[in-house]
């Protein structure tokens, strides 16, 4: 009996000792976590006080972009891959020893791009706005923003199938009297009309590609990114872009990012990074991985 009681007492002591050790361990862990949190808070407070945007981003280790969540293949919030603009931005940020974050700014809602600017980059929820086409002049942007250097150009590409599958140029299509699907009241529509090239008018690129998938036309001139979108929507379609086709310079438009005008050091960093990524061929590689042809910026 005495032996049993002694054994029970020993077990109680062991339990109490174990509970005490656990309590000490949890207390120590809490103190470490609290100290780490305080240090991180102090670091964030210190970095928040840095006025220069690029220096502040480097202090935090994060540079944030604004992008449209529903603009694939440029960018998308839910899905992989994330879009070529996102991947290009990630490469830019990597060159600066930072990581990329994205604040999603829907440009397709009421108020459009202007509202997206107000709710994002003007509100300093991000520092770089992605996915902008331009005419080369800053007056296309609000006064508070400025363009970066162009990182690529996009334009109309020639897509063929069926009886036009082996034709390579607009002249060959004209000689064979093959109608070309084109979006009405666009520069390409005007070009085909002016040069007496047979055409079939559609309401937008998506409708053109749907028409090709249905066999309504065997050739089309569409925006470069439209083919990548159509390949997802119509995976069994037989159309393809003509290899080596290069849009005329006056039918191509540069793509750029934008930053706030006061962020001069950030602008210089992004411009230098774009030059480096163009020289290395990285931007071309990213674009072509999305099924979008790469064309260098036009001057």
Predicted regions and their residues:
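Bacterial N-terminal signal peptides
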Residues: 26-34
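Periplasmic-binding protein-like
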Residues: 68-69, 150-160, 224-225, 231-275, ...
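Bilobed "Venus flytrap"/periplasmic-binding protein-like clamshell domains
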Residues: 64, 69-72, 81-96, 157-208, ...
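Extended ligand-binding regions for polar small-molecule ligands
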Residues: 41-54, 86-95, 163-164, 171, ...
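Extracytoplasmic small-molecule ligand-binding "clamshell" domains
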Residues: 44-132
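Sec/Tat signal peptide C-region and signal peptidase I cleavage site
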Residues: 36-40
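Bacterial N-terminal signal peptides that target proteins for export
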Residues: 17-26
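Short helices/loops that flank or line small-molecule/ion binding pockets
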Residues: 102, 108-127, 142-146, 171-172, ...
């Amino acid at each position: 009996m005495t032996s049993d009681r002694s054994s029970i007492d020993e077990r109680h002591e062991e339990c109490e000792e174990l509970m005490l050790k656990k309590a000490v361990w949890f207390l120590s862990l809490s103190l470490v976590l609290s100290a780490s949190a305080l240090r991180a808070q102090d670091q964030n407070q210190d970095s928040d006080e840095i006025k220069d945007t690029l220096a502040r981003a480097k202090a935090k280790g994060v540079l944030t972009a604004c992008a449209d969540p529903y603009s694939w293949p440029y960018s998308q919030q839910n899905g992989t891959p994330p879009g070529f603009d996102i991947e290009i931005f990630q490469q830019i940020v990597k060159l600066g020893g930072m990581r990329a974050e994205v604040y999603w700014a829907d440009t397709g809602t009421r108020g459009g791009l202007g509202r997206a600017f107000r709710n994002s980059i003007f509100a300093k929820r991000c520092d770089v706005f992605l996915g902008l086409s331009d005419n080369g002049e800053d007056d296309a942007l609000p006064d508070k923003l400025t363009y970066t250097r162009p990182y690529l150009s996009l334009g109309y590409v020639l897509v063929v199938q069926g009886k036009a599958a082996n034709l390579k140029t607009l002249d060959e299509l004209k000689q064979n009297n093959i109608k070309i699907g084109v979006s009405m009241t666009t520069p390409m529509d005007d070009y085909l009309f002016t040069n007496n090239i047979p055409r079939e008018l559609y309401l937008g690129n998506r409708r053109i590609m749907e028409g090709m998938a249905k066999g309504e036309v065997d050739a089309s001139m569409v925006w470069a990114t439209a083919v990548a979108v159509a390949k997802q929507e119509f995976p069994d379609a037989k159309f393809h872009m003509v290899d080596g086709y290069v849009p005329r310079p006056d039918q191509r438009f540069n793509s750029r990012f934008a930053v706030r005008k006061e962020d001069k050091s950030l602008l210089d960093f992004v411009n230098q990074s774009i030059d480096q990524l163009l020289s290395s061929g990285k931007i071309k590689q990213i674009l072509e991985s999305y099924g979008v042809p790469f064309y260098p910026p036009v001057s």
